[in-house]
């Protein structure tokens, strides 16, 4: 079994760019940014429980990494960068720390490196279980209306929230809930030490209005790029800013 993905081919000899979306997104999420790099072959992946991979369920990050590895092999991707937002960034960091043959580097936008104590994990588990229950039982428009009121999305205006609620409500609530719990921060290890000892290039992107993740970025041994005029979802709020950072990273 492999993950559903859309592949766009570029020039031979350059590494692939493999894009991983955030929670409730899909393979289209990164395409406005990715298509600015047409010289590179691009793979836009649907993570388990999402988009064309909605029917694929996992028990945890190990399963996601295994599926990602098999997907890369199926596309004969031998050299690549992982580019991930939020959940996709956490998947990218986990997979990279576990080891992926051919990995050039990881570019993470607003991805959490992991909670650092049992109390934080227990609180996150309670929160994610409550959200998962709502995703399973309530209309998605109602759940996402509340989801985008969370502090991390404080930089969004009302129009942006309405647009995201409409977009995300096309998902399958039950499969979102399953993926939310399988990849919860409550079950993700703290990756700070592994990332400090890494053998791959590591870059971190965060919006200038995303104070939480700017603080987290400062804790990481990563080259950090702050995206102007953006909050947590920087590639949606300022795609040109993210394109500029990726171009600098890739020496485009």
From Swiss-Prot:
An individual GO BP term: menaquinone biosynthetic process
Entry keyword Lyase: yes
Keyword Lyase: yes
Name of a matching Pfam family: Abhydrolase_6
Gene Ontology MF terms in the entry: 2-succinyl-6-hydroxy-2,4-cyclohexadiene-1-carboxylate synthase activity
Keyword list, A-Z: Lyase, Menaquinone biosynthesis
Pathway named in the protein's UniProt entry: Quinol/quinone metabolism; 1,4-dihydroxy-2-naphthoate biosynthesis; 1,4-dihydroxy-2-naphthoate from chorismate: step 3/7; Quinol/quinone metabolism; menaquinone biosynthesis
Catalytic activity: 5-enolpyruvoyl-6-hydroxy-2-succinyl-cyclohex-3-ene-1-carboxylate = (1R,6R)-6-hydroxy-2-succinyl-cyclohexa-2,4-diene-1-carboxylate + pyruvate
Enzyme class: lyase
Source domain of life: Bacteria
Enzyme Commission code: 4.2.99.20
Signal peptide boundaries: none
Gene3D superfamilies in UniProt: alpha/beta hydrolase
Subunit and partners: Monomer.
Family as reported in the entry's similarity comment: Belongs to the AB hydrolase superfamily. MenH family.
Reported function: Catalyzes a proton abstraction reaction that results in 2,5-elimination of pyruvate from 2-succinyl-5-enolpyruvyl-6-hydroxy-3-cyclohexene-1-carboxylate (SEPHCHC) and the formation of 2-succinyl-6-hydroxy-2,4-cyclohexadiene-1-carboxylate (SHCHC).
NCBIfam families, sorted: menH_SHCHC (TIGR03695), PRK11126.1 (NF008340)
Protein name: 2-succinyl-6-hydroxy-2,4-cyclohexadiene-1-carboxylate synthase
